[in-house]
A protein has these predicted regions:
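A structural signal for short hydrophobic/aromatic patches embedded in well-ordered alpha helices
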Residues: 26, 117, 135-136
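Long, compositionally biased intrinsically disordered regions
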Residues: 184-188
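All-alpha amphipathic helical-bundle segments outside canonical DNA-binding/catalytic cores
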Residues: 128-140
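Active-site activation/catalytic loop segments of kinase-like enzymes and analogous catalytic loops
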Residues: 83-127, 142-161
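Secondary-structure capping and boundary motifs in well-ordered enzyme cores
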Residues: 46-51, 78, 109-113, 140-145, ...
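ATP-dependent phospho-/nucleotidyl transfer catalytic cores
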Residues: 1-51, 56-70, 163-171, 179-182, ...
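Catalytic activation segment of kinase domains across protein kinase-like and atypical kinase folds
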Residues: 43, 57-98
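Phosphate/dinucleotide-binding and metal-coordinating scaffold of catalytic cores
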Residues: 9-13, 76, 93-94, 100-101, ...
């Protein structure tokens, strides 16, 4: 959020006035997005080795069997929260539309995909603490918001960080991520229930 706030002060491309709804959406959730970091700092969550870019394209698959062989792109590995890896996987894998989809109404979070991934994750990670399990949905929301804020910041700053192939692509990316967050908020109780059911 620091980068967003600094970019808003400068407004180098004079784009802020055009994206007030997106800015307001991001700022309204700023305090909540510190939940996981605050829990880490307070010692309520364990520090774990995390990948920090947990997308399907970072899993090497066998060409014949399509079974996973190993995780790749290890330059992002560092200490962190398991919730970040879980959350980024949900952001990427449970989304119903492409990251830069222009029609944000195509973007939702699939509860079916959320359930399947959650089931696999908690079974593969039997050492997750009760607090980690409780905050799994927050991991998904946090990582999705973080990406949305980063895309919005880059759009406001002139599209220097994320590669763009058309005008407004980073803004579209921000909007899809914010739509995904809004859909998670609508489905929040269901997400929490799924985690409880799959963690039994």
């Amino acid at each position: 959020y620091r980068a967003l706030l600094e970019t808003l002060k400068r407004d180098p491309m004079h784009r802020a006035a055009q994206v007030q709804p997106e800015i307001e959406f991001a700022l309204a959730r700023q305090a909540e997005m510190a939940t996981i970091q605050n829990a880490l700092t307070a010692g309520e969550l364990p520090l774990r080795v995390t990948h920090n870019d947990t997308k399907l394209n970072n899993v090497l698959l066998d060409a014949k069997t399509r079974k996973a062989l190993c995780v790749i792109d290890l330059d992002t590995v560092m200490p962190g929260s398991s919730l970040y890896d879980f959350g980024d996987s949900i952001r990427f894998g449970a989304a119903t539309a492409a990251e830069d989809e222009k029609d944000i109404f195509k973007m939702e979070m699939s509860l079916d995909r959320f359930r399947v991934f959650t089931r696999g994750y908690v079974r593969a990670c039997p050492g997750l603490t009760a607090k980690e399990l409780e905050l799994l949905p927050m991991g998904a929301k946090t990582m999705t918001m973080e990406c949305g804020v980063r895309f919005l910041t880059d759009y406001l700053d002139g599209d220097h960080y994320f590669a763009v192939h058309r005008d407004g692509q980073n803004l579209d990316r921000a909007r899809t991520q914010f739509k995904l967050v809004a859909d998670m908020e609508k489905k929040w109780d269901e997400m929490r229930k799924i985690v409880e059911e799959e963690a039994k």
